[in-house]
């Protein structure tokens, strides 16, 4: 199973990706985690990424795709993967499709977790208190939701046109949402 998990901040992508990893016995690949690991390892891509981030700039699609290509070449992804945090825009979706086609591992499905904006803000506010996440302050949350709406939401249409999209209600208990994802994937 080769899967992309989409959804706005606070929709439960990371939580459900971790649960799907255990359910399907395939790795959960987070581009944020990849970036941090490459920087920590001091790899050539990590050095480039660190320089970019030190300037306060966003890491380029080229660097992210290079990291993804290296990760997808590892043995543990032979039976599939769950990709979380990428693609974030249509250009990245096209690049990902090209990469996966090149390595002979096209996506099986893209799951979009749907959660109302008001509930997202509540969830994120609760997470900020519980985890002390600096990027979960109200102003940052509004900005992240707007960025998602402007940049990432068009990715939904991209995959819908290709017949890969499954929309799942992301509201409910962790088990309820996991069950809905399984049903959407025909499992």
UniProtKB/Swiss-Prot annotation:
GO molecular function: adenylate kinase activity; ATP binding
Region (NMP): 30-59
Keywords (A to Z) from UniProt: ATP-binding, Cytoplasm, Kinase, Nucleotide biosynthesis, Nucleotide-binding, Transferase
PROSITE patterns named in the record: ADENYLATE_KINASE
Substrates-to-products reaction catalysed: AMP + ATP = 2 ADP
InterPro entries referenced in this protein's UniProt entry, alphabetically: Adenyl_kin_sub (IPR006259), Adenylat/UMP-CMP_kin (IPR000850), Adenylat_kinase_CS (IPR033690), P-loop_NTPase (IPR027417)
GO CC field: cytoplasm
Disulfide bonds: none
Any single Pfam family the record assigns to this protein: ADK
Residues reported to bind AMP: 31, 36, 57-59, 85-88, 92, 133, 144
Domain of life (superkingdom): Bacteria
Subcellular location: Cytoplasm
Region (LID): 126-136
GO BP terms, alphabetized: AMP salvage
EC code: 2.7.4.3
UniProt-annotated binding residues for ATP: 10-15, 127, 172
Pathway: Purine metabolism; AMP biosynthesis via salvage pathway; AMP from ADP: step 1/1
NCBIfam families: adk, PRK00279.1-3, PRK14527.1, PRK14528.1, PRK14531.1, PRK14532.1
Subunit-structure text: Monomer.
Family, per entry: Belongs to the adenylate kinase family.
HAMAP family: Adenylate_kinase_Adk
Function: Catalyzes the reversible transfer of the terminal phosphate group between ATP and AMP. Plays an important role in cellular energy homeostasis and in adenine nucleotide metabolism.
PANTHER family on file: NUCLEOTIDE KINASE
Domain notes: Consists of three domains, a large central CORE domain and two small peripheral domains, NMPbind and LID, which undergo movements during catalysis. The LID domain closes over the site of phosphoryl transfer upon ATP binding. Assembling and dissambling the active center during each catalytic cycle provides an effective means to prevent ATP hydrolysis.
Protein's UniProt name: Adenylate kinase
Origin species: Xanthomonas campestris pv. campestris (strain B100)
């Amino acid at each position: 199973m080769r899967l992309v998990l989409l959804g706005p901040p606070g929709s439960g992508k990371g939580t459900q990706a971790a649960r799907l990893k255990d359910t399907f016995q395939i790795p959960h690949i987070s581009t944020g985690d990849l970036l941090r690991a490459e920087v920590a390892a001091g790899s050539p891509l990590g050095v480039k990424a660190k320089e970019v981030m030190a300037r306060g700039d966003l890491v380029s699609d080229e660097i992210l795709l290079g990291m993804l290509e290296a990760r997808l070449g590892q043995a543990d992804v032979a039976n599939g993967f769950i990709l979380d945090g990428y693609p974030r825009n249509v250009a990245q979706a096209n690049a990902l499709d090209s990469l996966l086609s090149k390595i002979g591992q096209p996506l099986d499905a893209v799951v979009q977790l749907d959660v109302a904006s008001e509930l997202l803000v509540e969830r994120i506010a609760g997470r900020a208190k519980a985890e002390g996440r600096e990027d979960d302050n109200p102003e940052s949350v509004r900005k992240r939701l707007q960025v998602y709406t402007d940049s990432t939401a068009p990715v939904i249409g991209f995959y819908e046109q290709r017949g890969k999209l499954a929309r799942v209600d992301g509201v409910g208990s962790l088990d309820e949402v996991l069950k809905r994802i399984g049903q959407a994937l025909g499992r």
